[in-house]
From Swiss-Prot:
Residues 46-57 have a biased composition (Basic residues). GO terms for cellular component: ribonucleoprotein complex; ribosome. This is Small ribosomal subunit protein bS21. It comes from Chlorobaculum tepidum (strain ATCC 49652 / DSM 12025 / NBRC 103806 / TLS). The keyword Nucleus does not apply. InterPro entries: Ribosomal_bS21, Ribosomal_bS21_sf. Residues 46-65 are annotated as: Disordered.
Length: 65
């Protein structure tokens, strides 16, 4: 569970910003979306490969630019 201590004289905006950062880094939302529905292992592997391929293509394009 993500928790944030309130510092003295800290605005709500700063507190909220720190909370959002911790929340994102903890991967709570990512994990929730991942477990929202079942994905077959074969499809999961296929998606992982395609994401990896796209990432490699982008990196290659950036190096060539």
């Amino acid at each position: 569970m993500v928790s944030v201590q309130v510092n003295e004289n800290e605005s709500i905006d700063k507190l909220l910003k720190r909370f959002k950062k911790k929340y994102e880094r903890a991967g709570v939302l990512k994990e929730f979306r991942k477990k929202a529905y079942f994905v077959k292992p074969s499809i999961e592997k296929r998606l992982k490969r395609s994401r990896s391929k796209r990432r490699a293509q982008r990196a290659n394009e950036e190096r060539n630019s």
